[in-house]
């Protein structure tokens, strides 16, 4: 019974870490990556559609993204969606493709990005700890329903080890992303 709770908690913790990983991937570090456009949705015939389902996104150079919509009539909508998003890049279009030129990061912008990274990481840590708390509450409830105290204690210890493991993983991701961003 406790093993099922621990297994479920571990799955939820993995998902929390994956969310942080995806958030970090969407933060640009002066290099062009298609993942910075993952959250951009375009109004395609009145339906909000992810940009990566409407166009081919490629990286021909280190600081250039090229977006080639399959339907050329959607180019103005794609430009509007990029401008509205929090990407912070102005698109330029030649009628068939849209180019995004990623500017060099200023020291001020780098510091700002590090703050955003730390905030996202803290949200991830809090999510992992909340999962631990909820699972501990479930274990305590099961203990009242009759599972042995030593089994409950073992479950709580295992849960704490998992929590430490996933919080450490988030911390390592923060260090790596911080180094990537602060690299000039």
UniProtKB/Swiss-Prot annotation:
Q: Where is this region: Disordered?
A: 137-158
Q: What domain of life?
A: Bacteria
Subcellular localization:
Cytoplasm
- What terms describe the molecular function in GO for this protein? ribosomal large subunit binding
**What InterPro entries does the entry give?**
Ribosome_recyc_fac, Ribosome_recyc_fac_dom, RRF_sf
Q: Which Pfam families match?
A: RRF
GO terms under cellular component: cytoplasm
A GO biological process of this protein is: translational termination
Q: NCBIfam families from the entry?
A: frr
> Which family, according to UniProt?
Belongs to the RRF family.
Q: What the protein does?
A: Responsible for the release of ribosomes from messenger RNA at the termination of protein biosynthesis. May increase the efficiency of translation by recycling ribosomes from one round of translation to another.
PANTHER family xref list:
MITOCHONDRIAL RIBOSOME RECYCLING FACTOR PSEUDO 1, RIBOSOME RECYCLING FACTOR
Protein name per its UniProtKB record:
Ribosome-recycling factor
């Amino acid at each position: 019974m406790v093993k099922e709770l621990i297994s479920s908690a571990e799955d939820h913790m993995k998902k929390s870490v994956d969310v942080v990983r995806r958030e970090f991937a969407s933060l640009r570090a002066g290099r062009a990556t298609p993942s910075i456009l993952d959250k951009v949705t375009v109004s395609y015939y009145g339906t909000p559609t992810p940009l990566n389902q409407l166009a081919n996104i490629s990286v021909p150079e280190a600081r250039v993204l090229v977006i080639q919509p399959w339907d050329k009539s959607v180019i103005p909508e794609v430009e509007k969606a990029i401008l509205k998003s929090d990407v912070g890049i102005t698109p330029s279009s030649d009628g068939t493709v849209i180019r995004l030129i990623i500017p060099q990061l200023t020291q001020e912008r780098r510091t700002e990005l590090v703050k955003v990274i730390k905030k996202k990481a803290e949200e991830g840590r809090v999510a992992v700890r909340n999962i631990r708390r909820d699972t501990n509450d479930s274990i305590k409830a099961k203990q009242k329903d009759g599972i042995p105290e030593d089994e409950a204690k073992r479950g709580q210890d295992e849960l704490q080890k998992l929590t430490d493991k996933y919080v450490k993983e988030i911390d390592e991701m923060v260090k790596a992303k911080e180094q990537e961003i602060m690299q000039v």
